[in-house]
Swiss-Prot record:
This is Putative zinc metalloprotease CT_072. It holds the Pfam family Peptidase_M50. The active site is at E21. Its EC number is 3.4.24.-. Zn(2+) binds at H20, H24. It is found in: Cell inner membrane.
């Protein structure tokens, strides 16, 4: 099937080029220009056939195509052989027609691509659209960059507007911040546990320096078709296909990235009695050797270590950054030795009594010290009904997500964590406590990383190779639950004009980012890369392939309309100058100006092709 998809991808790209050049051809004939040749591809002709006055060709270099119209070359002459005549005097020639007619011919190619795009998007719309992951287009946030979290954006929030435009998903947040180096967001904190509340924030953000600003929310459904690894911490949890992870250590969870971040933050989940009420707190664990302990409290810690039955040096023990008495009451904070360089959130208050650590009841500070050496998580899973797992229209999916919780039952289960008699099951919710997460390498086979190592070792640049190999080794040590999760599918089917607007907008944003130096040309794809993208689209399904065909057709139109010499937009600019100046072009100067741009264009396509081939063979 791979070969079939490759052939379909190549045919799709060839079709888009054909349509573009056909637009030029038909427009030229419509205004009375004489067309000499029509070619798909450049270079030596692999196939050629003359029909009437036009020679039709397929070139050996598949970088595009061209329509050669009589009189476009300065060296063209009319049949009289009069050397004093210019290209403007050649009958049925390109320059013999008015500038407006020439603009019509030049714009006809991109216009043909836009018409194809709207036609393809129309087929996609009336066939029901595409099945996509909920996270891809949701307005609900699944994970937030720490710098934005400090500004008030949290996982579970719903964004309505991003930099003044209706929000269409996490990709929009990335592209907007890439162009404007800031994010201005308006939205709401949905009514999960309390009343919904509007929010607005504006913060500087540079993706080139900070990475991704946020990710979309996901349903975090257990993929029962993939058996749990034998060493998974949840292997005996009794999970079923479609069970949804909704809560972990006091927080609703909205994405795999959020879950991973929480697992690797080295925090303990505490049940605390505060002023007659029970509250839940996540507090960072720190090494005792990193704290400013007085000799008295150091001896107290050593005594506590002995009582807890912990071996090793006291400085290597994890502890909470507080002085905690024998009954579990917080007496004072303890600062870090290097608190000027490292910030630490203190979430406990003086007088708090710790009654449970990671869901396990405690009676003394020795119990607390013993339990904070490791981290066990408390999880709540939701049994999803068949109706809740039904594929929804994307427009209705966000509200369905917000309404998918039964907060009364969920709160009752969550609030029982750390009690002597926990509510292990209520309604659709089930509590799984004292789960011991493990490093990735402990759960999974090393063989799964061998392919990534092999790809990384192929990088020629030593620093780049070392960087990726180090990342792979670091990933091995990341703490994991060892559970395969999937997202809920939604039906994404905006009307054709919305897809057109988004495609044109994305293309123009890319051009703008390139011009401002905020996007590297290495992000772009040439003909080989486009074929690979289309190949992937066909392998996913016909709707996905149609979406990519429409998007690439729009990109071809936008690219060719750029005001760059040798492109359609460059020639249109010359025609407009001719109209405004009311003077004919000096073809000698025009050709001299075109040569360097032609060389740069060829070099650019060669660069893109080599880059595409590098992705194919190196990865």
């Amino acid at each position: 099937m791979t070969i079939i998809y490759f052939v379909l991808a190549a045919l799709a790209l060839g079709f888009l080029i054909l349509i573009h050049e056909l637009g030029h051809l038909l427009a030229a004939k419509a205004v009375g220009m004489s067309v000499e040749s029509f070619s798909i591809g450049f270079g030596p002709a692999l196939v050629r056939k003359k029909m009437g006055s036009v020679e039709y060709r397929i070139g050996a270099i598949p970088f595009g195509g061209y329509v050669r119209i009589k009189g476009m070359d300065r060296n063209d002459k009319d049949n009289s052989g009069d050397k004093e005549k210019t290209v403007y005097d050649i009958p049925e020639g390109f320059f013999s027609k008015s500038p407006w007619k020439r603009i019509f011919v030049l714009a006809a190619g991109p216009l043909a691509n836009l018409l194809v795009a709207i036609f393809v998007f129309g087929i996609l719309y009336f066939s029901g659209g595409r099945t996509k992951s909920f996270s891809e287009y949701t307005s609900i946030v699944g994970w937030v960059h720490p710098s934005l979290e400090q500004q008030g954006l949290h996982a579970g929030d719903q964004i309505f507007f991003c930099n003044g435009q209706p929000y269409s998903g996490h990709k929009m947040a990335f592209s907007s911040s890439l162009l404007e180096r800031k994010l201005s967001l308006q939205g709401q904190h949905p009514a999960y546990f309390s009343e919904s509340e509007a929010f607005s924030l504006e913060a500087p953000f540079n993706p080139n320096m900070e990475g991704v600003p946020c990710l979309g929310a996901s349903y975090l459904l257990y993929r029962g078709s993939d058996p749990l690894p034998e060493k998974s911490p949840l292997v005996d949890a009794g999970l079923s296909e479609g069970d949804r992870l909704v809560w972990m250590d006091g927080l609703l969870v909205f994405s795999g990235a959020q879950v991973s971040q929480m697992l690797n933050e080295k925090q303990s989940f505490l049940r605390v009695e505060r002023q007659g009420k029970v509250v839940f707190v996540r507090q960072a664990r720190v090494l005792a050797g990193d704290l400013t302990l007085t000799p008295y409290f150091k001896n107290e810690l050593i005594d506590c270590q002995y009582e807890a039955g912990l071996k090793g040096k006291w400085a290597s023990l994890y502890t909470l950054p507080y002085i905690i008495n024998g009954d579990g009451f917080v007496e004072s904070k303890v600062k870090l030795l290097n608190d000027e360089r490292v910030s630490l959130d203190y979430n406990l208050e003086l007088g708090d009594k710790i009654v449970a650590v990671d869901g396990i009841p405690v009676m003394s500070n020795a119990d607390i010290l013993r339990l904070v050496q490791d981290h066990r998580v408390s999880l709540i899973f939701q049994r999803m009904s068949p109706e809740q797992l039904t594929v929804l229209e994307q427009k209705a999916a966000d509200q369905a997500f917000i309404n998918s919780y039964d907060m009364d039952d969920l709160l009752r289960v969550a609030e029982s964590v750390g009690e002597e008699r926990e509510v292990s099951r209520l309604g659709d919710y089930r509590l799984v406590t004292r789960v011991q997460p493990r490093p990735w390498a402990h759960i999974y086979s090393e063989a799964l990383l061998d392919k990534q190592r092999a790809l990384a070792s192929k990088f020629r640049d030593e620093q780049e190779r070392r960087y990726y190999l180090e990342r792979i080794e670091a990933e091995k040590q990341r703490i994991s639950l060892g559970i395969p999760l999937k997202d809920l599918a939604v039906q994404y089917n905006p009307d054709p004009w919305v897809l057109m607007e988004e495609s044109v907008s994305d293309s123009l944003k890319t051009v703008k980012a390139l011009g401002m130096g905020r996007v590297s040309p290495q992000w772009l794809s040439g003909p080989v890369g486009i074929v690979r993208i289309l190949h992937t689209g066909w392998s996913v399904g016909i709707p996905e392939a149609l979406a990519w065909i429409g998007l690439i057709s729009v990109n071809l139109a936008v690219l060719n309309l750029l005001p760059i010499p040798v492109l359609d937009g460059g020639y249109i600019l010359l025609c407009l100058w001719e109209i405004l100046s009311r003077r004919r072009l000096n073809m000698r100067l025009v050709e001299k100006a075109l040569v360097p741009f032609m060389i740069l264009l060829v070099l650019f396509f060669v660069f893109l092709t080599l880059q595409d081939l590098s992705r194919v063979f190196v990865g």
